[in-house]
């Protein structure tokens, strides 16, 4: 299939052939949901912790005798039923949030997202994308001239000037072809891919 190749003015100057397998897939909502959910789950770090009844600093002495007081039975002050007691099912740093997605499914999910971007006219290819100096103003003006806002730029290797220029733009993300994740592809309104990055993605995913 053919993808539009645009210039720095945002005009379609030519077209570039692309893999039908990667950019011509049907949109599979269930598969995309599974891939995105797995990506977000695998990005989580188990850094939360709560105390169980064995972790709280409470005495193990029985608060009062078992019978004869008229009060409810109580074994120790660390009981989850008591204020200041432990939690019944506490969160732990050892929690495992990872979801496994087969490589074939992941590639198919990325392909479905890219294909949908093409159908929605949100994906463009550029010959190369460089910034002459590490200035946010230069990059912002270049993207404005191209008619791109809230854009993810995918390159074959990250140019230092481009990376430094994009850091202060919250709606711009620059990544290498091997690090284009499904969440970012769906989150940004536009995706701009350099020609060399397109070849790398086809080699890795098609």
Curated annotation (Swiss-Prot):
Keyword RNA-binding set for record: yes
Superkingdom of the source species: Bacteria
Extent of Basic residues compositional bias: 59-70
Cellular component GO terms held in the UniProt record: ribonucleoprotein complex; ribosome
Pfam families reported in the protein's UniProt record: Ribosomal_L4
InterPro entries (UniProt xref): Ribosomal_uL4, Ribosomal_uL4-like, Ribosomal_uL4_dom_sf
One of the protein's GO biological processes: translation
HAMAP family linked to this entry: Ribosomal_uL4_B
Matching PANTHER family: 50S RIBOSOMAL PROTEIN L4, LARGE RIBOSOMAL SUBUNIT PROTEIN UL4M
Summary of the function given for this chain in its UniProt record: One of the primary rRNA binding proteins, this protein initially binds near the 5'-end of the 23S rRNA. It is important during the early stages of 50S assembly. It makes multiple contacts with different domains of the 23S rRNA in the assembled 50S subunit and ribosome. Forms part of the polypeptide exit tunnel.
Subunit structure: Part of the 50S ribosomal subunit.
Family membership: Belongs to the universal ribosomal protein uL4 family.
Protein's name according to its UniProt entry: Large ribosomal subunit protein uL4
Organism expressing this protein natively: Nitrosospira multiformis (strain ATCC 25196 / NCIMB 11849 / C 71)
